[in-house]
Amino acid sequence: MGMRMMFTVFLLVALATTVASFTLDRASNGRNAAADDKPSDWIALAIKQCCANPPCKHVNCR
């Protein structure tokens, strides 16, 4: 593999790493549209509502 090809591969890897890092950082920085409706948020909300209800709390919450 020639030097030019190795340099090109290096640049592609650096670009891919930068793009992946940027998108992961953006998703974890705040509450963007994709992160607002995660299933885990809905499950946590359902558990909180259930545990506020005494009959449900007695059966399902620990």
UniProtKB/Swiss-Prot annotation:
UniProt keyword Secreted, yes or no = yes
Renumbered to this chain, the signal peptide range is 1-21
Superkingdom is: Eukaryota
Propeptide intervals in chain numbering: 22-48
Keyword field contains Cell membrane: no
**Where is it expressed, tissue-wise?**
Expressed by the venom duct.
Note the InterPro entries from the entry.
Conotoxin_a-typ
Residues with PTM Pyrrolidone carboxylic acid: Q49
Quick one: a GO cellular component term?
Answer: host cell postsynaptic membrane
Pfam families for the chain: Toxin_8 (PF07365)
Molecular function as annotated in GO = acetylcholine receptor inhibitor activity; ion channel regulator activity; toxin activity
Task: Name where it's found.
Answer: Secreted
Which UniProt keywords are listed?
A: Acetylcholine receptor inhibiting toxin, Disulfide bond, Ion channel impairing toxin, Neurotoxin, Postsynaptic neurotoxin, Pyrrolidone carboxylic acid, Secreted, Signal, Toxin
**Cysteine-cysteine disulfides:** C50-C56, C51-C61
Principal subcellular localisation of the protein: secreted
What family is reported?
Belongs to the conotoxin A superfamily.
Q: What does this protein do?
A: Alpha-conotoxins bind to the nicotinic acetylcholine receptors (nAChR) and inhibit them. This synthetic peptide (10 uM) selectively, but weakly inhibits both rat neuronal alpha-3-beta-2/CHRNA3-CHRNB2 (63%) and alpha-3-beta-4/CHRNA3-CHRNB4 (37%) subtypes of nAChR.
What does the comment on domains in this protein's record state? The cysteine framework is I (CC-C-C). Alpha4/4 pattern.
Q: What is this protein called?
A: Alpha-conotoxin-like Qc1.2
> In which organism is this protein found?
Conus quercinus (Oak cone)
